[in-house]
Amino acid sequence: MERKGLAARSSGNPSPPALGEGPRPVPPPCVPSGGGAPERGQAGTAAEPAELIRRAHEFKSQGAQCYKDKKFREAIGKYHRALLELKGLLPSQEERDARPASSAGVPKSSRLSEEQSKTVEAIEIDCYNSLAACLLQAELVNYERVKEYCLKVLKKEGENFKALYRSGVAFYHLGDYDKALYYLKEARTRQPTDTNVIRYIQLTEMKLSRCSQREKEAM
């Protein structure tokens, strides 16, 4: 708004030059300076991967502390900030498939060492798992979003117990009992004695049994 005000004030007729003065030179157009805090995209472009990873790890740690303090909304914000720092460091599977082998540009991921790539993926997995955990603490749970985050984890780490279990819970509450049972049974193969998994499997099987009974009655 300040720039607009300046433009409005400078658009009026300038005062005539004093007697004996020549024509006044026309001032150059105002060009925004490069000062001030850079936007996230600019910072992300300029920062080295090691610095982005360090900041992401710091935000993730802050999110974990907020979760312990039961400040779930703040924790969600911290985990999102962590993921934002890592955005673009690891290409998605679609990007990897679409990128030609002789690409002229050097992607950010090529600047990562093997250890850095593993660290980035581990942080992403932790953040998505933690986001799902935070959402499940809400009074009104967004199970669609819980499912989304858990499936992101499973794309990277298909045997992740927490993501399997929470996927099953999300699908159960979304009414997709077949998928719920699949993910819950997958979770049970990782931790056969987990009481929460066993309880949700029982609940899901009861729902499926009722659905089957209704279908028979309808016939």
Swiss-Prot record:
Disulfide bonds: none annotated. Keywords: Phosphoprotein, Repeat, TPR repeat. The modification Phosphoserine is found at S102. PROSITE patterns: TPR, TPR_REGION. It holds the Pfam family TPR_1. InterPro entries: FKBP4/5/8-like, TPR-like_helical_dom_sf, TPR_rpt. SUPFAM superfamilies: TPR-like. One of its GO terms (biological process) is bone development. TPR repeats lie at residues 56-89, 125-160, 161-194. Residues 1-49, 94-115 are annotated as: Disordered. Belongs to the TTC9 family. This is Tetratricopeptide repeat protein 9A.
